[in-house]
Regions:
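Structured, active/binding-site neighborhoods that engage oxygen-rich ligands
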Residues: 1-286
Length: 286
């Protein structure tokens, strides 16, 4: 169902997006953001201490873990949740980047033989890592199942499951030819009231300034703030570069918002929408 070339382009898009966001990722202070020593037209080294070992072209821990999933899938030509969890656990235990609460709690559960081992995290970022699953999903039902199985490995909360299923279905409908707004509206109708509220807030905010909107919704990691923020990005912009620049200027968990938004946005767009200099990431997809 999913064109392999386009699926790989979406993996690349999500990684480029994460690397681009690295510069202001997890910067929350408004004064710092408005005076950020970064060039928003290119990739930048990180401002935040959490990424102190990183440089321009590197990824946040979101991009690194997306790359792990891509590596696993290209090596195995399938997604097996239990097998991937073992693969992921080996990777994360020797990882030099930031290890967030969801990962730490999941590792602790694995160590203590707690099943299911996924944390109760409601962080948005896990959803932005799902693009590689398109490569091994033969139909929409398998994609939805693969997404849920993947998300639950580290983010086993009902909100994370609900939000990831919503965006998986939006991706499917975008592949079927629906516009961004039509796909969001269609899947809103079959979602719970919380997700309906997030979608409505995001779409209704499209005429407002992105910096202000994201600060108002909440720029941090949780789905409760980031969901509406990424819908705002999708509703407001018809150009990938503009969308990612304005999102990065708002700081906070910029990568979590943008990775999902860029995947959905680029399904019917040429890869040429990504500026050439942004492709200088430290990974090869192909």
């Amino acid at each position: 169902m999913f064109n392999e070339k386009k699926a790989k382009e979406l993996v690349l898009t999500s990684l480029v997006t994460d690397s681009y966001c690295l510069g202001t990722h997890w910067v929350y202070d408004e004064t710092q953001l408005k005076n950020a020593p970064v060039d928003f037209n290119t990739l930048n080294e990180p401002m935040a201490m959490w990424h102190k070992n990183k440089s321009a072209g590197d990824f946040t821990h979101y991009g690194d873990q997306t790359l792990w999933l891509y590596e696993y899938i290209t090596e195995n030509e399938k997604f097996d949740a239990k097998d991937f969890l073992d693969f992921w656990a080996l990777k994360i235990q020797s990882y030099y980047g930031y290890v967030d609460g969801a990962c730490r709690n999941t590792l602790e559960n694995i160590k203590n033989e707690v099943t299911p081992s996924g944390s109760s995290s409601t962080d948005l970022s896990i959803i932005g890592r799902i693009a590689p699953l398109l490569l091994v999903s033969q139909n929409e039902q398998e994609f939805i199942k693969n997404v849920e199985d993947f998300v639950c490995l580290t983010h086993n909360s009902q909100l994370a499951k609900n939000a990831s299923k919503f965006f998986a279905k939006v991706i499917i409908d975008r592949f079927k030819g629906l516009s961004v707004i039509d796909a969001l509206e269609k899947n809103k109708e079959t979602s719970d009231s919380q997700i309906q509220g997030f979608v409505n807030q995001g779409i209704e905010s499209k005429g407002k300034v992105t910096f202000d909107v994201i600060r108002d919704f909440g720029p941090a990691c949780d789905i409760s703030g980031g969901f509406a923020g990424l819908v705002h990005l999708l509703a407001k912009y018809d150009n990938l570069k503009d969308m990612l620049i304005e999102n990065a200027k708002a700081g906070g968990d910029s990568s979590a918002r943008a990775m999902i938004a860029s995947i959905i946005f680029m399904i019917d767009k040429p890869i040429s929408q990504i500026p050439n200099s942004w492709l200088n990431i430290k990974a090869k997809i192909g």
